[in-house]
């Protein structure tokens, strides 16, 4: 894989998603009032999918004998093309080991509506798959959503939003295109030449395309995009459809797998490293993790009883908000099936606002974003208190997807995956030797080597790169600093059993774990050590009291300095966004660091960003976001 840094795409003004509305025409066909067209052929929707899109792309024959195959679709609709493709893949004993579908949809159905239309329109043989699709259907939030089926062997990456805005921001190596969507007369943007060219840049050398549409301007646009096109007999009442083949000599994407199947070495066994190792192991890669903490007989996050994962929102839906939203969804989908106590508890988060002015501004933000109310909604003080099960100081917003996570248990579970081995060692220096990167200890002895090395060692990453002569091209990374902080454990009985959900604002207070509620946290600049102590505990007690409106009477018996707690470091980069991706000046070296206070938000997402690029999969993030987090 070419370890390039993605250019930042120009940002378009935010436009909220407009969900699809279930409407049927007089013949009982699902109908789009927005575009004045039906969703499928009047004869047989699944038959159209098989005739036009599968046979039109030479499937299943073309995918046989391949390790992976990627399909790109415009217009997901109710998902019949995907379900038909899925069934064909299941039925073929010579299928590729991994099948990826990337599909764009400007007007997605809500989960309940999707299930209803599939119950009404999908054939009986696809109903079981339709149920699985609906069960994983994401909330109607703009951006990319990665779903996994068949134990991860089949992935569906949904792009919710305008196709002409999403298409230039996709990363993939596409083998077949399903060009669907409503007719050009009603939805010309779906067939815009610039949009088709943006999709065509993803085409593999032998890529094919198929579309039910045979309009002359569409065929001409596809020819200009680098395809040899022809008409073929259509399906049902249509005389013709369009087929295409990538022309030889046209530029192809450089997102081919990097050392496909080769072992990977991860430096760092904290949350970042564990998540990268887990993501790679799920894809069948052998991973070795270097754990410096084990040299001292320690475990990462030992004593860190619980932490919170809460998304953020912004009026302009800026990169931090988009990354946070994607990260929280990825964390839940990746970790929810882990064994207890590693699996997150999706208890929700009440995020309190400081004052009435900020609450009014937040209400305006939600009105602009128009996110689903079952994902985020305004709550007044009484509603917030009812959700928390305790009186709180103010109202704010409620994030239904807020989670409580036990970091130590999570890291242990991620590193226990099949294909992951751990070595107790400290990386002192990196050295290139042929096609391998060697990791040396302080005595210059080789600890491990691999063609691909991921540095996930937090604030030690700049030191390691500097000592290896590799830091100079990375000025942002060179400015990373370590910020100490501590959390305090409060007895749950002092809080009437503790809150039912995460309570956040100026600090945070978490639901009880093993009889203790975590209150946090402090920020200590310039500290020589990360320590718990009386001053930090006093700060955390005051923050907890501020969230509740007043200190509970039982707080009077809690003596700062005598309470249990945990202290650690945050690796902070300028802009407080993480750095994840390849190092352009050192092929084979990758970075996953700088997670600051949002390690839980970034870890699963950054792990999948790196693993997807290493394994030649469609990317789970848009290129403008990849540019924001690219190591530099």
Swiss-Prot record:
Disulfides per UniProt: none
Reaction catalysed by this chain? 5-aminomethyl-2-thiouridine(34) in tRNA + S-adenosyl-L-methionine = 5-methylaminomethyl-2-thiouridine(34) in tRNA + S-adenosyl-L-homocysteine + H(+)
Q: Where is this region: FAD-dependent cmnm(5)s(2)U34 oxidoreductase?
A: 267-632
Q: Which GO terms fall under molecular function for this chain's record?
A: flavin adenine dinucleotide binding; oxidoreductase activity, acting on the CH-NH group of donors; tRNA (5-methylaminomethyl-2-thiouridylate)(34)-methyltransferase activity
Q: Does Flavoprotein appear among the keywords?
A: yes
- Does the keyword Ribosomal protein belong to this entry? no
Q: Per the record, what is one GO cellular component? A: cytoplasm
- What does the protein in this record do? Catalyzes the last two steps in the biosynthesis of 5-methylaminomethyl-2-thiouridine (mnm(5)s(2)U) at the wobble position (U34) in tRNA. Catalyzes the FAD-dependent demodification of cmnm(5)s(2)U34 to nm(5)s(2)U34, followed by the transfer of a methyl group from S-adenosyl-L-methionine to nm(5)s(2)U34, to form mnm(5)s(2)U34.
Spell out the protein name for this chain.
tRNA 5-methylaminomethyl-2-thiouridine biosynthesis bifunctional protein MnmC
The organism named in the record is: Bordetella parapertussis (strain 12822 / ATCC BAA-587 / NCTC 13253)
Q: Which gene encodes it?
A: mnmC
